[in-house]
A protein has these predicted regions:
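A short secondary-structure junction signal
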Residues: 174-179, 208-211
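Extended, low-complexity, turn-rich repeat/linker tracts enriched in Gly/Pro/Ser/Thr and Asp/Glu
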Residues: 168-175, 186-191
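Bacterial Sec-dependent N-terminal signal peptides
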Residues: 1-23
Length: 316
């Protein structure tokens, strides 16, 4: 019996040293910038609070926030908009205290209402999202929300998994809201879910400024049911190369047609994913943690996704 116990302990210690866990900067959710935005009088003139996962700071003025400073890879769905001089703040991602101490990130799916001049009600559906890249403020139009997002950050590693703590509240109802703000919100068939994914991409830019990409690694998970107790140290495996032939592959794990990045000319352009290759060295990493799986303005208000302690796992 003693020999068996010793062997088990040896195996446990060997496994511990067979891998290493590297924190992603600010991924412990303990540092936040708080922004206070005073909305235009036309919208009621209230002061709204926006949060950024960033060095601890407080900003008491309207204006764009410049993501990507101080080695910070994170951006959020929280945004400051200035449309022909009308200023508005929208925030569905925020810090929240954990029951056993520390701080986590809470992401809500919300129908955000705007009352113009006290008469016209406008509602838009906004999921809370945390991602690697930049949100390019100010937002000047709602026609194409992706034109203000620079997806991904430079990265050359080859991790085996994305690791994080999570819990979620997911409605079982089989309908979602479509609410773009131009008309009354409509119900349509669907089931909204929280989502986590990581892409490792090899990118390059051609002479015309187009950004091309080969998918090197993929990790993807949708959370279809509520998990109201914390799951600590959840691991999302990263699979290298072409995953389309795997039994667990789903179409949504494939190439994203709407994601964009800023090219060397300072222009936001589509990221043209063109193939799979496990042998290439990654140049960029895209991590997305979001309370809703649908495109902009579609989802189930009331869903919530909490995350904490976001790390990368490597083999030694």
């Amino acid at each position: 019996m003693k020999k068996i116990i010793v062997c088990l302990l040896v195996c446990l210690v060997a496994n511990m040293y067979a891998e290493r866990i590297e924190p992603i900067p600010f991924g412990d959710m303990e540092s936040w910038t708080v922004r206070y935005i005073k909305e235009s009088k036309l919208l009621g003139g209230k002061t709204k609070t926006l949060y950024a996962l960033a060095p601890t700071d407080t900003i008491w003025k309207n204006g764009p926030y410049y993501y990507g400073k101080n080695g910070n890879p994170w951006a959020t769905s929280n945004a400051y908009a200035n449309v022909i001089g009308i200023e508005k703040a929208a925030g569905t991602m925020m810090p929240e205290k954990r029951e056993d101490g520390g701080t986590c990130c809470r992401m809500n799916v919300e129908l955000l209402g705007v009352r113009v001049m006290g008469m016209i009600d406008i509602e838009v559906l906004v999921p809370g999202t945390l991602f690697t890249g930049r949100n390019l403020e100010p937002i000047t139009t709602a026609k194409d929300p992706y034109q203000n997002i620079d997806f991904g950050v430079p990265f050359t590693g080859r991790p085996t998994a994305l690791m994080f703590d999570y819990k979620c509240i997911i409605s079982p109802e089989q309908w979602v809201w479509y609410a773009k703000g131009m008309a009354k919100p409509k119900k349509q068939e669907g089931h909204d879910q929280a989502e986590a994914y990581i892409y490792l991409q090899h990118r390059w830019e051609d002479e015309e400024g187009n950004i091309h990409s080969i998918r090197v690694g993929t990790g993807y998970k949708r959370f279809a049911e509520s998990q109201e107790e914390w799951v600590n140290g959840y691991r999302l495996p990263i699979h290298y190369g072409d995953i389309t032939g795997e039994s667990w592959y789903k179409d949504y794990m494939g190439f994203k047609e709407m994601q964009r990045a800023v090219n060397s000319k300072g222009k936001v352009v589509l990221i043209q994913e063109e193939g799979w290759d496990a042998t290439l060295e990654p140049t960029h990493m895209v991590i997305m943690l979001t309370s809703g799986r649908y495109e902009a303005f579609v989802g189930k208000a009331g869903n919530v996704f909490w995350v904490d302690n976001v790390n990368l796992v490597y083999e030694n």
